[in-house]
Curated annotation (Swiss-Prot):
Laccase; part of the Pks1 gene cluster that mediates the biosynthesis of an anthraquinone derivative pigment that contributes to conidial pigmentation that provides protection from UV radiation, heat and cold stress. The polyketide synthase Pks1 produces 1-acetyl-2,4,6,8-tetrahydroxy-9,10-anthraquinone though condensation of acetyl-CoA with malonyl-CoA. The dehydratase EthD and the laccase Mlac1 further convert the anthraquinone derivative into the final conidial pigment. It is found in: Cell surface. This is Laccase 1. Pathway: Pigment biosynthesis. Its cofactor is Cu cation. It comes from Metarhizium majus (strain ARSEF 297).
C-alpha cells in the first residue's frame, strides 16, 4: 500500500471516529428559590430554572463537557451516577475524593466520555442536598446492535425494529420522595430530637405530585400483611401520615447514651397530615408509533423511599437495570431502591384511555402512595380506566401479582442476568474486604466499617485523588480501602450484628467507578476464612454463573434481628478514588460511606492542569 493510500485511510478513519464521538457541551446553572412541586411551598434547587433537572441525552462515546455554575449560597457538586468515568476520575463529582466542592459564585467543568450506554442519572453529592431537588435523567444511546435483546421479547421483525426505535426515544420518569423541609432542616430534626426521623409528604414523578391524607384507619389497613406482627409491638399504629411512631425501639435501635426529645419534632413531621391538591405527571403515549411499543426509563431519585412501579392493566418487560442490559422478563410490578434505574418496554395493546401509574413507597418506613397517568394519545375522556395491580400502599390486589413481580432482595427472586452474558471469575478473588454495616452511638449514626463514621466534609480540602496517602497513620484510614489494579475484589457486607443495631432496615448500596456482581447472599454471621470456603459450605447461597451486575444493591430487611450477609465481586480496571455508600440520604449523612482507592499501584498521574488544585 502506498504512503498516500495509508494516509488517506488514516484520515477516513479519523473522520468516522470523530463523526461518531462528537463533543457535546452542556451548561447547568444551579439556583435556590421557592417552589411547590406538591402544592405546598418550600425552598428547593432549580437547574436551568426547572425542577427536576433537565434530561441529558448523548450518544455512546460522545465527549461531554458540562459547565456547572453554582448560583446558590451553599456548596454543590454534581455526580454522574452510573457513568464509569474511565480515565476521568476527576469528573466523578464526589467532594473530598475527586474534587473540592463548588463554592457559591464559582463554576466547575466536568469532562468525560459518555459511557456506558443506557439509562443513568445525575444528582448533587454535597451533604444531604439530594433532598433539595438537584437530580435529572441521563440517556446514553448505544452504538451496538440490540437485536438479540429484543428478540427475547418478540420474534417479529417489525416488533424488533419498533422496540429499537422506542428504546432510542423513551419516556422518562424521574421518581423522587419529597418533604416539606429542606435537607438542613430535616437533618436538624433528627439531631435535635435524638431520633432518626424519616417521615415524608409526597412521592413525585417528574417533579409533580400531591399530598394525600386518606385517614389513619385507611393507612393502618394498608400496612403490608404481617408487618406489625413480625416487626413491631402488638397494637402498633401508624399516624395519619402513614408513619410509625418515632420512638419505637425497633425503629431507633439502641439503647444509646443520648437524650431522646420527641417533643422537639415539629408539628406535621410525623403526624398532622395537611392535604394539597396539585397535579400529577401525565405521560402521553401513541399506540400508532413503533408498532405499539413504548420504552420508559425510570430513575429512582428517592432519598429514603423504596418504590414499586406498576401501570394499570399493562404488563411490562424489564430489560435494563442500572444502565446494564438484562435478559428481559415480563412483570406487572417491580420494586426499586433509591439510586436505581430501570428501563421497561410496554406494549400499548389496551383500550385507549387513561391508565394510572402506581408508584407507592413499598418499604417498611411509611405507607405512602404516589401516582402518575399514562394516557393514550387521542383519548378525550377524563375518566380513568384499567385494572390496578397495587393498592395505595403497594400491596398486591390479586394473587397473580406476587407471581409476576420483581423483588430484588434475594438471589432466588432476582434472576435478572446480564445481556450479553457477563460473569465474574469463579473461585476466590484476589482480595476480600469484610464491611460490617449498622448504627453506632446514636440512631442517626451509621457506619460501613464497624465503628468509623464517614464525615460529610471528609477530605474536602485535600481530595484523595490528589492526596491518596492523606489518611495514612490516622484514624480516618479506617474510612479507606485500597485495591490493586488488575485484581478481583470481593466486598462482603454484614448487617444486623452491631450492638444496638440488630434490628436493621435495608441499605441501598452504591459503588462509584464500577459495577459489581452480587455472587452471594445468606443468613447468619460471616465467619468464613474466605469466600471460596463459604461457597463450598453453602453452595445454594451463591451464584457465579448468572449473577446480576449493577452499581446499586439492596441489603436485607432484618427488623426481626436475624443477621444477613451479601458478597459483591468486581474487577479493578479503573484506578481512582470511588465512594461506596448507602444511597439513603439520612444514612450517608450519618456516616455510611467508605472511600475505595481502586488501583493504588496504577494511580492517575497525569491529571489535566485545569483540574490541578491551587
Amino acid at each position: 500500500m502506498s504512503r498516500f493510500a495509508r494516509l488517506l485511510l488514516m484520515v477516513v478513519a479519523l473522520f468516522f471516529t470523530n463523526a461518531w464521538a462528537k463533543t457535546v457541551k452542556e451548561t447547568l446553572r444551579i439556583t435556590w428559590k421557592e417552589g411547590a412541586p406538591n402544592g405546598q411551598a418550600r425552598e428547593l434547587i432549580y437547574t436551568n430554572g426547572q425542577f427536576p433537572s433537565p434530561t441529558l441525552v448523548w450518544d455512546e462515546d460522545d465527549d461531554v463537557e458540562i459547565t456547572v455554575y453554582n448560583e446558590m449560597a451553599k456548596n454543590v457538586t454534581v455526580h454522574w451516577h452510573g457513568l464509569d468515568q474511565k480515565d476521568t476520575p476527576w469528573s466523578d463529582g464526589t467532594p473530598g475524593l475527586s474534587q473540592r466542592p463548588i463554592q457559591p459564585g464559582n463554576k466547575f467543568v466536568y469532562k468525560f466520555k459518555a459511557s456506558p450506554p443506557g439509562n443513568h442519572w445525575y444528582h448533587s453529592h454535597e451533604k444531604m442536598s439530594l433532598v433539595d431537588g438537584l437530580y435529572g435523567a441521563i440517556h446514553i444511546r448505544p452504538k451496538g446492535d440490540r437485536t438479540g435483546l429484543w428478540s427475547q421479547i418478540s420474534q417479529d421483525k417489525d416488533d424488533i425494529k419498533a422496540m429499537e426505535n422506542a428504546a432510542h426515544d423513551p419516556e422518562y420518569l424521574v421518581v423522587s420522595d419529597w418533604s416539606q423541609y429542606t435537607s438542613e432542616e430535616y437533618w436538624k430534626i433528627s439531631t435535635d430530637s435524638g431520633l432518626l426521623v424519616f417521615c415524608l409528604d409526597s412521592i413525585l414523578v417528574n417533579g409533580k405530585g400531591e399530598v394525600y391524607c386518606p385517614g389513619q384507619k385507611f393507612l393502618q389497613a394498608e400496612l403490608a400483611p404481617g408487618l406489625v406482627e413480625d416487626a413491631f409491638p402488638p397494637g402498633t399504629e401508624v399516624s395519619d401520615k402513614g408513619c410509625f411512631p418515632a420512638d419505637l425501639d425497633q425503629v431507633q435501635g439502641g439503647p444509646w447514651n443520648i437524650t431522646k426529645r420527641p417533643d422537639l419534632i415539629p408539628p406535621r413531621v410525623q403526624e398532622g397530615c395537611v392535604a394539597s391538591s396539585h397535579e400529577n405527571a401525565t405521560i402521553v403515549v401513541d399506540p400508532s408509533r413503533n408498532n405499539g411499543w413504548v420504552s420508559m426509563h425510570i430513575v429512582a431519585a428517592a432519598t429514603i423511599a423504596q418504590i414499586t412501579f406498576s401501570v394499570d392493566s399493562h404488563e411490562f418487560w424489564l430489560y435494563e437495570i442500572d444502565g446494564n442490559y438484562v435478559n428481559p422478563r415480563k412483570f406487572v410490578s417491580a420494586v426499586m431502591s433509591a439510586g436505581e434505574t430501570f428501563s421497561v418496554m410496554i406494549k400499548l395493546d389496551q383500550k385507549p384511555g387513561r391508565y394510572t401509574m402506581r408508584i407507592p413507597n413499598s418499604g417498611a418506613s411509611q405507607v405512602l402512595g404516589g401516582f402518575a397517568e399514562m394516557v393514550y394519545k387521542g383519548c378525550e375522556s377524563e375518566e380513568k380506566t384499567g385494572k390496578a395491580y397495587l393498592s395505595y400502599g403497594g400491596n398486591p390486589t390479586s394473587p397473580d401479582v406476587e407471581k409476576n413481580s420483581f423483588f430484588p432482595w434475594q438471589l432466588d427472586t432476582d434472576h435478572m442476568s446480564p445481556w450479553p452474558p457477563n460473569k465474574p471469575r469463579p473461585g476466590n478473588a484476589d482480595e476480600e474486604h469484610l464491611l460490617v454495616l449498622g448504627r453506632v452511638g446514636a440512631p442517626y449514626n451509621y457506619t460501613m466499617n464497624t465503628k468509623y463514621l464517614y464525615p460529610v466534609d471528609f477530605q474536602n480540602d485535600d481530595p484523595l485523588l490528589f492526596y491518596p496517602n492523606a489518611t495514612r497513620d490516622t484514624e480516618n484510614d479506617g474510612l479507606v480501602l485500597r485495591t490493586k489494579n488488575g485484581s478481583w475484589v470481593d466486598l462482603i457486607l454484614q448487617v444486623s450484628t452491631l450492638p444496638g443495631d440488630t434490628s436493621s432496615f435495608e441499605h441501598f448500596m452504591h459503588k462509584h467507578g464500577s459495577k459489581t456482581w452480587r455472587i452471594g447472599f445468606g443468613t447468619g454471621v460471616w465467619n468464613y476464612t474466605s469466600v471460596e470456603e463459604a461457597i463450598k459450605e453453602r453452595p445454594k447461597d451463591f451464584n457465579l454463573e448468572t449473577p446480576g451486575l449493577r452499581d446499586t444493591w439492596i441489603t436485607a430487611f432484618s427488623i426481626g434481628g436475624e443477621a444477613y450477609w451479601s458478597v459483591f465481586r468486581y474487577f479493578v480496571d479503573n484506578p481512582g478514588p470511588w465512594l461506596f455508600h448507602c444511597h439513603i440520604e439520612l444514612h450517608l449523612m450519618g456516616g455510611m460511606g467508605i472511600a475505595i482507592l481502586d488501583g493504588v499501584d496504577a494511580w492517575p498521574e497525569h491529571i489535566p492542569e485545569e483540574y490541578q488544585l491551587c
